[in-house]
């Protein structure tokens, strides 16, 4: 074949229309697996290469999406980032990672900053945004929020039911006879962030069981890191009476707490139960292994990418959607499994 192969050449080789070849190149899902494979074989056989610059110029798109998360040294976000990148790659997109440190200015930069000019849309896990930040954002840039949402409505959103998840975890502890259950990382006032929602679920479970709520057992932390869990557990061991269970609002806190309890020779689960959130890989390998709430991270990634690409393809389409992802309480050794 003389010259560089074109879409027309690929179509003739595969026995399909040029439109079908274009659909395969753009990873449209309605193409059958058999046809998709035939087109890919033709592309490989002819050495066809997509003219990315030309396609982006025609579409006004970059083929890139941004994932903005608070931290990458927190295992939950690192694992989620890997899943989002894999899902985006499957859909023919490249992911630009943006670490915000949970700082409002950096979260705003993901939506309005220099980098936002080079991305087709943003998946953002916010910690510090104000409701007005979303109300005044550039509507030309599609956005999907993960986890916390500063304001109701107006933006596509993917999350687990944090209230139900914490209620289930607390009910598990109550079923084991625990009554003085401390919430490490909890919060009873302020906006409806993840920590507040999980504390609400904890309180609901106590109420359903007829156990009085004790505000002294809600322990705020500076950060959701291992050391903060260890500090909180150490402080709780010096109270009288001690708690008989810890509901830690992420696995980093729980694993830090386990270390502090081990150093103080407190038997887990003999004297005290520990439950975490997120089901990070380390939770399966701690001693004792950690009972934890496992959000469906694979589904979070799939739904977030799908919602964002739908919004990129049809900005004025469906109204903003809330996608609630399932969760599972994984019972392990830290609560007697």
How would you label these PLM feature ranges?
Residues 118-126, 182-185, 219, 240-250, ...:
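Periplasmic-binding protein-like
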Residues 34-37, 46-113, 117-121, 188, ...:
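Amphipathic helical "hinge" segments at domain boundaries
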Residues 234, 239-245, 249-337:
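Flexible loop/turn connectors
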């Amino acid at each position: 074949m003389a010259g560089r192969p074109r879409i027309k050449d690929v179509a003739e080789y595969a026995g399909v229309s040029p439109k079908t070849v274009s659909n395969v190149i753009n990873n449209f899902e309605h193409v059958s697996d058999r046809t998709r494979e035939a087109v890919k074989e033709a592309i490989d056989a002819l050495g066809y290469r997509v003219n990315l610059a030309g396609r982006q110029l025609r579409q006004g798109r970059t083929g890139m999406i941004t994932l903005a998360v608070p931290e990458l040294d927190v295992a939950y976000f690192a694992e989620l980032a890997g899943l989002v990148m894999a899902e985006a790659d499957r859909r023919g997109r490249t992911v630009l990672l943006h670490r915000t440190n949970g700082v409002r200015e950096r979260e705003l930069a993901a939506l309005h900053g220099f980098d936002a000019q080079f991305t087709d849309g943003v998946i953002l896990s916010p910690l510090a945004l104000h409701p007005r930040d979303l109300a005044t954002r550039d509507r030309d840039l599609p956005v999907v929020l993960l986890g916390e949402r500063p304001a109701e409505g107006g933006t596509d959103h993917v999350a687990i039911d944090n209230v139900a998840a914490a209620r289930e975890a607390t009910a598990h502890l109550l079923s084991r006879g625990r009554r003085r259950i401390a919430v490490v990382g909890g919060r009873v006032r302020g906006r409806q962030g993840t920590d507040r929602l999980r504390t609400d679920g904890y309180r609901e479970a106590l109420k359903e069981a007829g156990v009085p709520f004790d505000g002294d057992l809600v322990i705020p932390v500076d950060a959701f890191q291992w050391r903060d869990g260890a500090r909180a557990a150490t402080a709780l061991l010096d109270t009288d009476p001690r708690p008989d269970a810890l509901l830690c609002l992420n696995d980093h806190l729980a694993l830090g707490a386990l270390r502090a309890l081990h150093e103080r020779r407190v038997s887990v689960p003999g004297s005290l139960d520990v439950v975490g959130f997120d089901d990070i890989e380390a939770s399966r390998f701690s001693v004792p292994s950690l009972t934890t709430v496992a959000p469906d991270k694979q589904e979070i990634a799939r739904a977030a990418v799908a919602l964002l690409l739908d919004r990129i393809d049809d900005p004025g389409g469906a109204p903003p959607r809330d996608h609630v992802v399932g969760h599972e309480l994984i019972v392990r050794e830290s609560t007697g499994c």
